[in-house]
Amino acid sequence: RLTLSMPFNKGRSAGRVGGRMTYGGVLACNLIKNLRGKSLFFYDFNAKVMHTFNEKNRLFVSTYLGDDILGVESLMTITYGNKNFTTRWNHIFNDKLTSNLSVFYTKYRYKIGVSMNPYDFSITAGIEDVSAKYDFTYLMNDNISIRYGASATFHQYGQGKLDDKTGAIAAYMDVDPSNEVKRKALEYSLYFSNNHKLGTLFSIRYGLRLSIFQNIGKETLFLFDENYNCYDQINYASGEIFNTEANLEPRLAAMYQIDEFSSIKASYLRTVQYAQVATNATGGIPFDLWFPSSPNIKPQKCDQFALGYFRNFRNNEIETSVELFYKNIHNVIDFADDAFFIGNLYVDGEVRAGKGRAYGAEFLARKNFGKLSGWISYTYSRSKRTVKDINFGEEYVSPYDRPHNVSIVLNYELTKRFDVSATWVYNTGQPVTYPYGKYTVDGVTYSIYNGERNKSRYPDYHRLDLSATLKCKDRHKNWKGEWNLSVY
C-alpha cells in the first residue's frame, strides 16, 4: 500500500494518490490448507485533486480503479471490477446558499470464467453509468436548512456476454454466443428536503423525491404470456423511448432530545429501485444479472420504518445506540427454478416477481477518543420473500438473509508515533440451493433439485485484520510519511 498527499500551486491546490495491491496466493494459499490450489488477488488505485480558484469556487477531481479476483486452479475464476471518475464544482453564492455540480462515470463489471474439460468459457455482465447532478443547500436561518436538486443518468446494462473458446457450452445449451443482451435507460430525479428544528428538543426532517425512468432503444422487447412463454416481439430504434415509469418517494424523520446525552429518532421513507439484481442461488455457477425496469419487470418499491434510541456517556466519549427497522418490499424479483440465462434472449421470461420483507435490530457502542478507541456493532436481520412459482409459493429466505453480523474495530495508541489496530468481522453464511441428487445421460451429468429454495447456507464468514503503524519523524516541512504493516 502506498499513499502520497501534497499541496502545490502555492497552497491553492492539493493532490492525493494511493494504491494497494496484494496477491494472496503467494502467502495465504500456501499457509492455509483449505486455500491450496486457489489464487486471491486484488488491487485498487485512487487519486484526488482539489483546486481553489477563489474563496467561492473550488474544483474536485477524483478517480477510483479496482479489481478483485478469486481463482480455483483449472476450474473457475471470478473477477469483480469497478471504475469511477468524478468531477465536482463547489460554489458559494453567499453565506446562506451553496451548490455542488457533479459529473461522474461509473462502471461495474462481473466476470466468471470456467475451465473444465471440455468447457472453456467466460460470462461477463455489468452496469455502466454516466451521470450529472446539481445540489443546492440553503440555510434559511438557525432552525431551517433546505436542500434541493436534480440529477440525470444514462444507464447501460450488460446481461451476460458469452465468450466460448471451445464451443462446447454453446453446443450443450443450444445457444448462439452472439446473443448478447444489452439494454439502455435514462433516469431523472428532482428532490427537496428540509431539516427543521422546532424548539430546542424536537426536530423533523422531511422531503420528497420525484424519479422518472425511461427505457430507450436500440432494443428488441420480447412479450410473454401468463405462462412466461414468448408470444411476440417489438423492435425499437436507437434512441427511441418505449417505456416510462414515474414515482414519488416521500420521507419523514423526527428526533426528540430527551436530555443532554440521549435522544429518540423515528423515520419513514419510500424508495424506488429501477434496477434489480437476480441471483443464481444454486450451488453451480454463482452469477448475478441486473435487470432494469421495463414492460416485463416493474420497479421495486420499499417502505421502510425505523425507530432508534441513542445515548452518550462520559461527556460524549462513548456513544451507544439501538435501532429497529422493518421493510415492506413490492415487486422483488428472483430467477425461476432451472432458469436458463446464458446467451438467452428471452431472459425476462426466466424472472419471477413477488413481495418481500426485512426486519432487524442494530446495536452499536463507540469510543471516540483516548488511547483506546473504536467500536463494537452487532446486527440481527432477516430478509424473506414470497414469489410465485418459487418454493411452492411459500415464503423463503432471500439471498441477502444473513441473520448475524458482528464488527469489532479497536485502535490503541502506544505512543504519539506508534499505534496498533485490530478488526474482526463475522457474517452468517449466504443462503444457497444445493441439488439433492444427480443423473448422467450420454456422459453428461445433470443436477436434481426438489423445488425448495435457499434451504442451505455457505459456511459462515469471519476475518481478522491486524496492523501496526509507525509515523515518521517530522524532519521535512513538505511531506509526512508512515510505515504500516498489515496482516489479513
Language-model features and meaning:
Residues 147-263, 274, 390:
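Signature of Gram-negative outer-membrane beta-barrel scaffolds
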Residues 325-328, 346-436:
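Gram-negative outer-membrane beta-barrel transporters
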Residues 5, 50, 303, 397-488:
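Conserved C-terminal beta-signal and adjacent last beta-strands/turns
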Residues 40-161, 319-321:
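Outer-membrane beta-barrel domain signature, strongest for Gram-negative TonB-dependent receptors
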Residues 1-52, 60-64, 322:
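Predominantly transmembrane beta-strands of Gram-negative outer membrane beta-barrel pores used
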Residues 8-14, 55-56, 95-98, 141-145, ...:
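Short loop/turn motifs that connect adjacent beta-strands in outer-membrane beta-barrel proteins
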Residues 129-133, 179, 187, 292-298, ...:
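Outer membrane beta-barrel strand-and-loop segments of large Gram-negative receptors
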Residues 109-110, 156-171, 214-230, 256, ...:
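Surface-exposed extracellular loop regions of Gram-negative outer-membrane beta-barrel proteins
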